[in-house]
């Protein structure tokens, strides 16, 4: 059975990590990881906690637009918690570096539903060093959500032969290929490289417009 936890502040994170630690002691890491447990928000996490959660396969269901709206040295987080603590919230890079699976969402109606807003916010984090790459953000906004929902067939959330035909068609402008190494990035516009181009989503770039939405082969919009 999969359990989900609404976890925001440092006290809540500490309680949940301690509970998982006891579960791991009783049942072992493999049994805990197999369940695909998740935490919603998990905004305040330390490096030690992130390492444990990554080792245990605990998914982080997070909302990047929280940082876009309230992060930074002069945002709501800093005003209420101080710059030191406020700048350490929503550290997606820390979570990813420790192997914590990420799933991006909006927490609507708290923030808007547009998934590209979340992708842009995660790749342009207001705290230096807390961002993830565009490709990692895209994966968290697509496959990550399915994984958090318990779907682990390896194809759902991708555009590959045999995957469910669930996708959206977007109007986009400039595209970039985001890859781990520059040498790959220079030649990998070929679809066979399996590194397709993604929209350019800097802070001043226009957001995308959805033209069509398809769910399991049925057109539901456009």
Each language-model region and where it sits:
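Short amphipathic alpha-helical segments, especially helix-boundary/capping motifs
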Residues: 25-27, 66-69, 93-96, 118-123
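Active-site microenvironment of metallo-dependent hydrolases
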Residues: 7, 97, 101, 108-222
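Feature representing long, continuous alpha-helical segments
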Residues: 14, 18, 37, 51, ...
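Active-site core of metal-dependent hydrolases
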Residues: 1-89, 103
